[in-house]
Amino acid sequence: MKILLRLGAAVLIAAVVFATLGPPRYRPHSPLGQDGEHALAFVLVGLAVGLAFPRRKLLVAAVSVALIGLLEIMQLWAPGRHARLEDFVVDAVTACVGLVGAAVLGWLAARWRGSASQ
């Protein structure tokens, strides 16, 4: 199960990196708008990474925020892309929301397993 969670997280991260740095014409668009799309993508990334690496919560959060910052900076060299502080804040905060969601799910699963064994 751990391998599947990590593989899923890697695929999701790769998709977000491509959507962020790839040609703008290939970026998916939705009725959520730019901030909504960013929020959804990074909540899912945070959730996936948090489920894939549940024992290193603070390290995963710190690395996630740092890599999100790097991803935003890399847009300075991507044609047709732009780096914005607002995007970094939305992406970092929503990734952390996803990480908290993963921690809550882990806590609930542990409680459920504990009550099922009694």
Label each PLM-derived region with a short phrase.
Residues M1-F88, A92, C96-Q118:
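Bulky hydrophobic segments
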